[in-house]
């Protein structure tokens, strides 16, 4: 758990959240998640069985004592807005606690949508000023982690910083996917590079680079001045990582905050857990992380609960089918409302209301809400999108050629099906990769399989009649 150096530090850390407003940037499309974000914003994507991705940032705010929160939305926001209204409306407005939705509005002063992360905040400055906060915490709404923001606030105040950026070491091979910083011994940021082609390594640790987590703390008045300057700067992309943070390094007013100082964990022996689930590969792996025997992210820690909208669902059920086969699961997460009948589920995540019929094997797969799996199916290393009905007898993830003809795969950057319905998978997972399956493609496949069964049954009837007639003629 997070530790404080003294009682005075602890007391100050408890006071600072009351002077703070958190702004969660939740308007991104998340195009690398392909069809998972075709109809919903990335922070609204399902995760870990019962949660949405944004629940982690929201829960971190509440658990840290930051109870004034603005959620900035834009792309496909309906699902996200609905989730927040249903699951996060319990804060006490009389105590000045709230989750405020800030959609893109194309105000009179600008007819454009949000042009970047900084512009998303800038276009809401009139609202944010009325919050009357001393400190602004800016968060990405699409990361999976548990963090005590009060500890980062304390670090920000004690160093006298105008801006503080949370940081974490990442493999040098992945550094080009993040904002990378160089720091002094006391973590003052001296240089910042947004997604550099050749990221500089950490001194003394050539295998890692120091990456930004997309978490910023600003003194409120200083942030307002910065955003107004950036808004009037020709050629700016109006982005924190590309424009705001790099210019602050020259002013020597920005510090880094190591994530291990504020990471919340129930097991000090495990490394700090933070995942950017911006690709299907990363999303699939992060979900299955939770199904491991000892996951690095403890979802059962009562001291730091992850809250979400709770649907009134019955418990998951594992039943015996008519043949006597028992439904069973191993190293998996199975959500409320699921029924597994005479099938085996291994190292997988079943989201709410999933139905798995008899004689199926589900291995290393994610079945999103309302998926229905017909009898005798075998699914391996798949992501099955919401409300898909897998037809009886379908096998996915065992034959590379067949999968390439029907779905996008992750092997060698993904195979594109002629139909173009399934979401392309980025990255490579051995040996076969995993597949992303969408409803509209499965409808076509289901019709083909049913037609095939119809032809086979009629052929069997014809052959039976033929042999009967032949036997009658032979008897005469």
From Swiss-Prot:
<dbReference type="InterPro" id="IPR005835">
    <property type="entry name" value="NTP_transferase_dom"/>
</dbReference>
<keyword id="KW-0547">Nucleotide-binding</keyword>
<dbReference type="Pfam" id="PF24894">
    <property type="entry name" value="Hexapep_GlmU"/>
</dbReference>
<dbReference type="InterPro" id="IPR056818">
    <property type="entry name" value="GlmU/GlgC-like_hexapep"/>
</dbReference>
<feature type="binding site">
    <location>
        <begin position="194"/>
        <end position="195"/>
    </location>
    <ligand>
        <name>alpha-D-glucose 1-phosphate</name>
    </ligand>
</feature>
<feature type="binding site">
    <location>
        <position position="179"/>
    </location>
    <ligand>
        <name>alpha-D-glucose 1-phosphate</name>
    </ligand>
</feature>
<keyword id="KW-0067">ATP-binding</keyword>
<comment type="subunit">
    <text>Homotetramer.</text>
</comment>
<dbReference type="InterPro" id="IPR029044">
    <property type="entry name" value="Nucleotide-diphossugar_trans"/>
</dbReference>
<dbReference type="Pfam" id="PF00483">
    <property type="entry name" value="NTP_transferase"/>
</dbReference>
<keyword id="KW-0808">Transferase</keyword>
<dbReference type="InterPro" id="IPR023049">
    <property type="entry name" value="GlgC_bac"/>
</dbReference>
<protein>
    <recommendedName>
        <fullName>Glucose-1-phosphate adenylyltransferase</fullName>
        <ecNumber>2.7.7.27</ecNumber>
    </recommendedName>
</protein>
<keyword id="KW-0320">Glycogen biosynthesis</keyword>
<dbReference type="GO" id="GO:0008878">
    <property type="term" value="F:glucose-1-phosphate adenylyltransferase activity"/>
</dbReference>
<dbReference type="GO" id="GO:0005978">
    <property type="term" value="P:glycogen biosynthetic process"/>
</dbReference>
<keyword id="KW-0119">Carbohydrate metabolism</keyword>
<feature type="binding site">
    <location>
        <position position="114"/>
    </location>
    <ligand>
        <name>alpha-D-glucose 1-phosphate</name>
    </ligand>
</feature>
<dbReference type="InterPro" id="IPR011004">
    <property type="entry name" value="Trimer_LpxA-like_sf"/>
</dbReference>
<keyword id="KW-0548">Nucleotidyltransferase</keyword>
<feature type="binding site">
    <location>
        <position position="212"/>
    </location>
    <ligand>
        <name>alpha-D-glucose 1-phosphate</name>
    </ligand>
</feature>
<dbReference type="InterPro" id="IPR005836">
    <property type="entry name" value="ADP_Glu_pyroP_CS"/>
</dbReference>
<comment type="function">
    <text>Involved in the biosynthesis of ADP-glucose, a building block required for the elongation reactions to produce glycogen. Catalyzes the reaction between ATP and alpha-D-glucose 1-phosphate (G1P) to produce pyrophosphate and ADP-Glc.</text>
</comment>
<dbReference type="InterPro" id="IPR011831">
    <property type="entry name" value="ADP-Glc_PPase"/>
</dbReference>
<dbReference type="GO" id="GO:0005524">
    <property type="term" value="F:ATP binding"/>
</dbReference>
<comment type="similarity">
    <text>Belongs to the bacterial/plant glucose-1-phosphate adenylyltransferase family.</text>
</comment>
<keyword id="KW-0321">Glycogen metabolism</keyword>
<comment type="pathway">
    <text>Glycan biosynthesis; glycogen biosynthesis.</text>
</comment>
């Amino acid at each position: 758990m997070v530790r404080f150096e003294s009682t005075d530090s602890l007391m100050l850390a408890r006071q600072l959240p009351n002077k703070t407003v958190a702004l969660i940037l939740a308007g991104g499309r998340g195009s690398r998640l392909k069809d998972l974000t075709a109809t919903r914003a990335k922070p609204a994507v399902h995760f870990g069985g019962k949660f949405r991705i944004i629940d982690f940032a929201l829960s971190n705010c509440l658990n840290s004592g930051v109870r004034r929160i603005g959620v900035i939305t834009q792309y496909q926001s309906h699902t996200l807005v609905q989730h927040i209204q249903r699951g996060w409306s319990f804060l006490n407005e009389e105590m000045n606690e709230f989750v405020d939705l800030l959609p893109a509005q194309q105000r009179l002063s600008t007819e454009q949508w949000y042009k970047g992360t900084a512009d998303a905040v800038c276009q809401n400055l009139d609202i944010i000023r009325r919050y009357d906060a001393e400190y602004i915490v800016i968060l990405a709404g699409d990361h999976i982690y548990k963090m005590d923001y009060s500890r980062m606030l304390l670090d920000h105040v004690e160093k006298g910083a105008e801006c503080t950026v949370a940081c974490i070491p990442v493999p040098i091979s992945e550094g080009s996917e993040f904002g990378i910083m160089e720091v002094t011994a006391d973590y003052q940021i001296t240089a910042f590079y947004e997604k550099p082609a050749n990221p500089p390594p950490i001194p003394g640790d050539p295998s890692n680079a120091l990456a930004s987590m997309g978490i910023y703390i600003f003194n409120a008045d200083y942030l307002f001045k910065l955003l107004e300057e950036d808004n009037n700067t020709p050629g700016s992309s109006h982005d924190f990582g590309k424009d705001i943070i790099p210019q602050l390094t020259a002013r020597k007013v920005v510090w880094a905050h190591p994530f291990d100082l504020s990471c919340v964990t129930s097991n000090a022996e495990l490394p700090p857990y933070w995942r950017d689930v911006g690709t299907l590969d990363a999303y699939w792996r992060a979900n299955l992380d939770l199904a491991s025997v000892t996951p690095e992210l403890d979802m059962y820690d009562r001291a730091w609960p992850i809250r979400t909208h709770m649907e009134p669902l019955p418990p998951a059920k594992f039943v015996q089918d008519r043949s006597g086969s028992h439904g069973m699961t191993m190293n998996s997460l199975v959500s409320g409302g699921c029924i597994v009948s005479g099938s085996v589920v291994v190292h997988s995540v079943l989201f709410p209301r999933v139905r798995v019929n008899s004689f199926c094997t589900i291995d290393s797969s994610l079945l999103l809400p309302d998926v229905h799996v017909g009898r005798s199916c075998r699914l391996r290393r798949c992501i099955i999108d919401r409300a898909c009905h897998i037809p009886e007898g379908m096998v996915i993830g065992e034959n590379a050629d067949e999968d390439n003809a029907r779905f996008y795969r992750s092997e060698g950057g993904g195979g594109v099906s002629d139909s173009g319905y399934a979401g392309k998978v980025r990255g490579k997972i051995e040996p076969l990769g995993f597949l992303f399956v969408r409803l509209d493609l499965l409808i076509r496949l289901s019709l083909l399989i049913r037609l095939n069964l119809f032809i086979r049954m009629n052929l069997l009837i014809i052959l039976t009649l033929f042999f009967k007639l032949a036997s009658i003629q032979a008897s005469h």
